[in-house]
Amino acid sequence: MEITLEKISEDNRAEYSNFEVKTDLGNYQSRIRPKEDMDIVGWYYIIFENKPIGSIWLEKKTGDSFAVLGIFIADESYRGRGFGKQAIKRILELEQQHMDIAEVRLHVRMSNLRAAACYKSCGFYEFDRYERSDGISVISMKKTIRRHI
């Protein structure tokens, strides 16, 4: 069960609205797209059997030595099947040559145990815990990557 990543562009971005109507994403995901004020390093659809099942991106601010990873699998029937792990490994392989960063960071809700386990299996480790102003408890994780020089 292999996934592929397809770069999101102006030509295929309209399909993204399908994810925005998924009602349960807000239960475990704070954002479903890169931040507008960030430099997007890579933004992709996660494709399985020729169908977009989610999205993954790396974003950073100019001058930062790290990028932030965002990912979601939109349809619950595709969660827990290893697609997220494949997508994370694939985006790091694809974008590593373009990244001038030392690490990748992410934030996951403490209640999202499945995602936290996925990130750990991809080599991320916890470096902080905090509670957001809306009361949601969050784990911050990071992974050191090899710099391309």
Describe the residue ranges of each PLM region:
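Conserved GNAT acetyl-CoA-binding A-motif
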Residues: Q97-H107
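Conserved N-terminal entry element of GNAT/NAT acetyltransferase domains
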Residues: M1-D11, T144-I149
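Active-site acidic-Proline motif in GNAT/NAT acetyltransferases
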Residues: D75-S77, R81, M110-S111
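Conserved active-site alpha-helix within GNAT-family acetyltransferase domains
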Residues: K85, M110-D128
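Conserved acetyl-CoA pyrophosphate-binding loop and the N-cap/start of the following alpha-helix
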Residues: Y78, G82-R90
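Conserved beta-strand-loop-alpha-helix junction that forms the acyl-donor binding cleft
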Residues: L106-A116, R132-S137
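Acetyl-CoA-dependent GNAT
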Residues: E10-R13, N18-Y78, L94, H98, ...
